[in-house]
Every structure is written in C-alpha cells, then in structure tokens.
C-alpha cells in the first residue's frame, strides 16, 4: 500500500444522519423512537434501578449498619511507625500532628503493638495497649498517662 493509492472511504463521504427531518429521510415521523410511551418523549429516561414497578432491590433488603461519627476523631498508631522517626524522643498528640502521622482533626490516639521499637521514647497523653506498653518499657522508654 502506497500513499498515492489511498482513497476516501465510502462512509467518509456519507453525510451525517439527520433524524426527524421528513418522511423522505428514512428517519422521519417517529425518528427511530417507536410509537408513544415514556421512552419516545423528550427527557423520557428510566433510571437504572427501575424494575418495572416491582419493589426495587434497595427497598426489599433491610437497612443495616451506620457510619460512626467518632471515627473522625480517633486514630491508632503502630509501634513500627514511631520507630521510623529516629530523632523523636518525646511523643504526644501535637507532635504526631506536626510530623503528619495523624490528621489535624484527630483528638484521641491509641498506640498498638505492631512491630517492635528498639530505642527509648517517652509517650504522654496517649493511650497505649498492654503489649505496646511492655515493648516500650523493655526498650527503656516511659509511658505517662
């Protein structure tokens, strides 16, 4: 195939189909929409969840669960996340916010034992699980309530 042997496609030359422009166009009168009914009208759309008048699935199934409002204010930190910041000796809520480890809206933090900590740190004003407390104290750290 060469550039000089290329020709326009038959479909390229064909003009755009203009519906509802007289009987002679082939798409006159109803314009491909059929006769009457909701789908023939302008703006006549049926939502995806419509089941033909039958009670829809989202109303047949019972409600369950809820979104807790407390979730916005509580967070948990793992021990290995604290171990990543080697220059921190003293840890409290405001310091965790400064180093972007928690969101600014968080008011309560709990430290959980996931991983190990190998250096002494001082934790104040944060709740700590039993396992995390043992791990911190065995590394030479202190947990203040």
UniProtKB/Swiss-Prot annotation:
The keyword rRNA-binding applies. Coiled coil: none annotated. InterPro entries: Ribosomal_uL15, Ribosomal_uL15/eL18, Ribosomal_uL15/eL18_sf, Ribosomal_uL15_bac-type. It comes from the Bacteria. GO terms for molecular function: rRNA binding; structural constituent of ribosome. SUPFAM superfamilies: Ribosomal proteins L15p and L18e. Residues 23-51 are annotated as: Disordered. One of its GO terms (biological process) is translation. The keyword DNA repair does not apply. It holds the Pfam family Ribosomal_L27A. One of its GO terms (cellular component) is cytosolic large ribosomal subunit. Keywords: Ribonucleoprotein, Ribosomal protein, RNA-binding, rRNA-binding. Residues 32-47 have a biased composition (Basic residues). Binds to the 23S rRNA. HAMAP family: Ribosomal_uL15. Part of the 50S ribosomal subunit. Belongs to the universal ribosomal protein uL15 family. This is Large ribosomal subunit protein uL15. The gene is rplO.
